[in-house]
């Protein structure tokens, strides 16, 4: 589909206009009722006009963000950066990252005739939804942040997800890829315009992949022995095949220096080198972690490829207006007690392992609360959560001496208790709670410096209620 074809869409029929009108009416009703229902307008529109996405006109430029871990955070960062830079943007923050959520966002961002109100669309895209969305909405830029194992019952394994994205990307799309991920950096060779970003070796890197499982143990090209030179996070890093020589692609944007104390990092723009000298720019990062760094660098590189000047990006980040969303990480305090909520994607061993490593790497004595069971899934008597992923996640982090207490809350508490015991966590330190309020009341506030809550991304409201109750206890003590 050409840019002109995408802008106008397939021919608009009476069925399309009816679907658009009903979708807009659904959006208006939801707004009046103060309900989110982000996918409802798209769902009803698609029910009336099954090829609705093909027919609705698109903004002049389209950017999608996909990948296993960090796509929501990265997409939100990119949205904020582009809005601060003055671009006229439609996003799917209030919709969803599958086809009906994207349709809902386009409905809300269109006139009564279907014409787009905004010149740029920047949206998060679910990996499996690539096969339904990309044939009808060709992105100018597709950012793939990474590929890991994910929810087993839905996504099977990284090879399967890779194959879905790989076959769906149009040849005309400009790919922005993580050169440190030897899985996703190989996506869609039919797309010849490719931009790679990378983080250079850091002092605290590991010699090989961290964790009890690794998503890339053999060369993805020949199956030979893959030898890691260093790893930043899980399998993300630098490696080479001892058989065929396969290795990471050369980066166009390279993070050359990180100052954790100053909360700054420097990016060398190799792709913009002149006379053998590449320009370098230093940026602010609001809260450092290797995960946050990857997410922010991915957003910055995409913004640069959209034509935003590096100096403008420096100004935006220095203002402090753009940061990791509070729905993923937030910290408060009560009488000098740190209260930290960190999102951990449920049924995702990599996300949970990373969250636990970050929590346990924080200084001081701590109580850790695990709210990893999907709250809404647990209310459905016809569904059950696959708990095998517990044995792919690194709960061994919680066996450290600085973790004074572990409180487990959720429908699968007994399953998680067994995993914690196998991980070597002292049973005397573990308590089980029925509700988030019970979990807050079970925390022993004596002898600790902070309370950390790792929660499933669908349990944000429960995590907030938990922290409110802990705050209340501290202030009333």
Model-inferred region functions:
Residues 78, 82, 102-106, 296-306, ...:
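Buried hydrophobic packing segments
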Residues 2-31, 36-38, 216, 223, ...:
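ATP-dependent carboxylate-amine ligase
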Residues 95, 126, 180, 288, ...:
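Short beta->alpha junction loops/turns
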Residues 74-75, 131-133, 153-154, 186-188, ...:
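Short glycine-/acidic-enriched loop or helix-start segments at secondary-structure transitions
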Residues 68, 96-97, 288-290, 307, ...:
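Short, surface-exposed acidic/glycine-rich loop or hinge patches that mediate macromolecular interfaces
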């Amino acid at each position: 589909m050409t840019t002109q074809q995408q802008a106008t869409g397939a021919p608009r029929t009476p069925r399309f206009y009816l679907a658009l009108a009903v979708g807009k009416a659904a959006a208006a009703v939801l707004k009046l009722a103060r309900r989110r229902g982000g996918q409802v307008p798209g769902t009803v529109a698609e029910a009336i006009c099954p090829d609705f996405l093909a027919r609705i006109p698109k903004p002049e430029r389209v950017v999608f963000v996909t990948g296993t871990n960090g796509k929501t955070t990265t997409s939100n960062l990119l949205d904020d950066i582009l809005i601060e830079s003055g671009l006229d943007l439609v996003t799917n923050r209030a919709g969803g990252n599958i086809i009906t959520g994207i349709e809902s966002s386009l409905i809300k961002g269109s006139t009564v005739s279907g014409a787009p109100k905004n010149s740029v669309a920047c949206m998060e895209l679910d990996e499996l939804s690539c096969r339904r969305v990309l044939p009808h909405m060709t992105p100018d830029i597709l950012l793939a942040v990474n590929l890991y194992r994910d929810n087993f019952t839905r996504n099977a394994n990284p090879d399967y997800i890779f194959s879905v994205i790989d076959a769906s990307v149009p040849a005309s799309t400009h790919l922005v890829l993580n050169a440190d991920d030897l899985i996703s950096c190989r996506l869609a060779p039919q797309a010849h315009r490719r931009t790679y970003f990378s983080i250079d070796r850091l002092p605290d890197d590991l010699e090989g992949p961290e964790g009890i499982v690794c998503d890339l143990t053999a060369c993805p090209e020949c199956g030979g022995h893959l030898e890691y030179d260093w790893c930043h996070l899980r399998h993300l890093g630098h490696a080479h095949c001892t058989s065929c020589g396969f290795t990471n692609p050369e980066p166009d944007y390279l993070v050359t220096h990180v100052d954790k104390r100053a909360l700054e990092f420097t990016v060398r723009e190799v792709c913009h080198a002149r006379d053998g000298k590449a320009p370098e720019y230093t940026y602010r990062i609001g809260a450092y972690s290797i995960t946050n760094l990857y997410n922010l660098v991915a957003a910055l590189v995409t913004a640069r490829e959209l034509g935003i000047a590096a100096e403008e990006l420096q100004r935006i980040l220095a203002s402090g207006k753009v940061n990791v969303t509070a729905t993923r990480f937030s910290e408060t305090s009560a009488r000098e007690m740190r209260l930290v909520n960190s999102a951990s994607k449920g049924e995702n061993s990599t996300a949970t392992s990373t969250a636990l490593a970050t929590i346990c790497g924080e200084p001081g004595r701590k109580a850790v609360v695990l709210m990893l069971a999907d709250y809404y899934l647990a209310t459905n008597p016809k569904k059950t959560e696959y708990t095998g992923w517990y044995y792919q996640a690194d709960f061994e982090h919680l066996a450290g001496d600085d973790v004074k207490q572990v409180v487990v809350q959720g429908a699968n508490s007994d399953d998680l208790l067994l995993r914690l015991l196998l991980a070597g966590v002292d049973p005397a330190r573990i308590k089980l709670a029925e509700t988030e309020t019970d979990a807050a009341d079970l925390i022993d506030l004596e002898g600790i410096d902070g309370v950390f809550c790792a929660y499933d991304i669908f349990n944000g409201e429960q995590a907030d209620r938990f922290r409110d109750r802990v705050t209340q206890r501290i202030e009333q003590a």
